[in-house]
UniProtKB/Swiss-Prot annotation:
GO terms for biological process: fusion of virus membrane with host endosome membrane; receptor-mediated endocytosis of virus by host cell; virion attachment to host cell. Disulfide bonds join 85-235, 116-153, 178-216, 283-296, 305-314, 368-389. GO terms for cellular component: host cell endoplasmic reticulum membrane; host cell Golgi membrane; host cell plasma membrane; membrane; viral envelope; virion membrane. The record marks 33 as: Important for GP-C-mediated membrane fusion. InterPro entries: Arena_glycoprot, Arena_glycoprot_zinc-bd. It comes from Ippy mammarenavirus (isolate Rat/Central African Republic/Dak An B 188 d/1970) (IPPYV). Zn(2+) 2 binds at residues 459, 461, 467. This is Pre-glycoprotein polyprotein GP complex. Belongs to the arenaviridae GPC protein family. GO terms for molecular function: metal ion binding. Residues 2-17, 59-436 are extracellular. HAMAP family: ARENA_GPC. Zn(2+) 1 binds at residues 57, 471, 479, 481. The gene is GPC. Keywords: Disulfide bond, Fusion of virus membrane with host endosomal membrane, Fusion of virus membrane with host membrane, Glycoprotein, Host cell membrane, Host endoplasmic reticulum, Host Golgi apparatus, Host membrane, Host-virus interaction, Lipoprotein, Membrane, Metal-binding, Myristate, Transmembrane, Transmembrane helix, Viral attachment to host cell, Viral envelope protein, Viral penetration into host cytoplasm, Virion, Virus endocytosis by host, Virus entry into host cell, Zinc.
């Protein structure tokens, strides 16, 4: 008690010293940040979730963000785009304005001859040109097609019947026939996202001196048969989705997407210079609902700290150390990635491509199904979390992000303010009680950082589906509001 009274008696003299002001400031910041970490580490969220799961859910998130939804009617796309679906691993369907094609993997041959008189069928106008356009696009996507005896076709009576011979049963066959038309058919089928019964084996150099590679595939079926059919409910258990050609096939863009995670309104975490979470990093990453800021500071602080300051002060200062060169590399990598994504999205839109899986990835937000998407609407500012590629600006479909120098300027200002020469001269005038307060606050802050690092889960997800917020699922994977009403689905905990 005497030390506390003495400490408060010396307060007027304490605040006269710059170093003491710094310690007081850092202590208050550490305490406030520690309290904030306790509030946001997930522990309170986990407790509230366990108390409310399965009982209530709200469309208001963080008091200001409203959950809204946009529903896309994909049925009208069938007027301009062919739709596709799969009944099982061997039967796939494409339909266009009431008529369709059936693509079947089978071991039974339909055509016994080995020729395809496409020119004669074209002169006699024997087939549906819209459906034949789909077949032609698929055929032209087959790499290195130079073995016409490997396919057969028949257009008698206006019926489309095309058969591709396949011969890849195991790994050895796939390697031996890697450059044949059969492998090309499997390659094209695989890139159409219909390859659940096709196995990727290996890749071999082309041997033409171009440095390109040929991908080898295997399947247990002997033939691929394409026939026109009258459309019926062939895919009752599968939602038909648009299929695309051209750029998505030639560029083989299959995994480029924009990813945004829904995080707390203001969540700070330790990371490395690229923004990746790293307990040993010297960067503070502030995550918001719509963006993430990287707050890092220069190596000069650490150099001067190691030369003239004690260990406690340095440990705190190292938390805000940053290498500017690493930030420049990070910015260039992000800009390169954005340019690549811009190219992919523009190619998709220019070719009238809206593929189900890619659309889901591009949204990067909670969703209920493939046609209804949820997004956040800020009731104060009007900002929404819909992807920028949906907003047309300057004739493009994706706004390019240009980084400013605010991070570097803020780093320099912080270093200049914290590392003044007067600190070295007046460091010895710091009272012991203030040092104890500083040590306590930094220890409290370190403990709360550990709570963040263990990543306490806060809610349940259904395995294989998106974030169910604001719905709170119970152990049976259901919510009382009726949005999730299929019990027994596997769940997992998420932060």
């Amino acid at each position: 008690m005497g030390q506390i009274i003495t400490f408060f008696q010396e307060v007027p003299h304490i605040i006269e010293e710059v170093m003491n002001i710094v310690l007081i400031t850092l202590s208050l910041l550490a305490i406030l940040k520690g309290v904030y970490n306790v509030m946001t580490c997930g522990l309170i969220g986990l407790i509230s979730f366990l108390l409310l799961c399965g009982k209530s859910c709200s469309l208001i998130y963080k008091d200001t963000y409203n959950f809204s939804s946009i529903e896309l009617d994909l049925s009208h796309l069938n007027m301009t785009l062919p739709m596709s679906c799969s009944r099982n691993n061997s039967h796939h369907y494409v339909f266009f304005n009431g008529s369709g094609l059936e693509m079947t993997f089978t071991n039974d041959s339909l055509l016994n001859h080995k020729f395809c008189n496409l020119s004669d069928a074209h002169k006699k106008n024997l087939y549906d040109h819209a459906l034949m356009g789909i077949v032609t696009t698929f055929h032209l996507s087959i790499p290195n097609f130079n073995q016409y005896e490997a396919m057969a076709c028949d257009f008698n009576g206006g019926n489309i019947s095309i058969q591709y011979n396949l011969s890849h049963n195991d790994r050895t066959d796939a390697m031996n026939h890697c450059g044949t038309v059969a492998n090309g058919v499997l390659d094209a089928f695989y890139r159409f996202h219909w390859g659940r019964n096709i196995t990727y084996i290996a890749q071999l150099p082309n041997g033409d001196g171009t440095g390109r590679w040929t991908f080898c595939y295997a399947t247990s079926y002997k033939y691929l048969v394409i026939q026109n059919i009258s459309w019926a409910d062939h895919c009752q258990m599968s939602r038909p989705t648009p299929i695309g050609f051209a750029s998505i096939l030639s560029q083989r863009i299959r995994s480029i997407y924009i990813s945004r995670r829904l995080m707390s309104t203001f969540t700070w975490s330790l990371s490395d210079s690229s923004g990746t979470e790293n307990p040993g990093g010297y960067c503070l990453t502030r995550w918001m609902l719509f963006a993430a800021d990287l707050k890092c500071f220069g190596n000069t602080a650490i150099a001067k700290c190691n030369l003239n300051h004690d260990e406690e002060f340095c440990d705190m200062l190292r938390l805000i150390d940053f290498n500017k060169q690493a930030l420049k590399t990070f910015k260039s990598e992000v800009n390169h990635g954005l340019q690549l994504i811009t190219k992919a999205i523009n190619a998709l839109i220019n070719d009238q491509l809206i593929m189900k899986n890619h659309l889901r990835d591009l949204m990067g937000i909670p969703y209920c199904n493939y046609s209804k998407f949820w997004y956040l609407n800020d009731t104060r500012t009007g900002r929404v979390s819909l992807p920028k590629c949906w907003m047309i600006s300057n004739g493009t479909y994706l706004n390019e992000t240009h980084f400013s120098d605010e991070i570097e300027q803020e780093a320099d200002n912080m270093i200049t303010e914290m590392l003044r020469k007067e600190y070295q001269e007046r460091q010895g005038k710091t009272p012991l009680g203030l040092v104890d307060l500083f040590i306590f606050s930094t220890s409290f802050y370190s403990i709360t950082v550990f709570l963040h690092l263990i990543k306490i889960p806060t809610h349940r997800h259904i395995v294989g589906q998106g974030c169910p917020k604001p719905h709170r699922l119970n152990s049976r994977a259901i919510c009382s509001c009726g949005a999730y009403k299929q019990p027994g689905l596997p769940t997992k905990w998420k932060r």
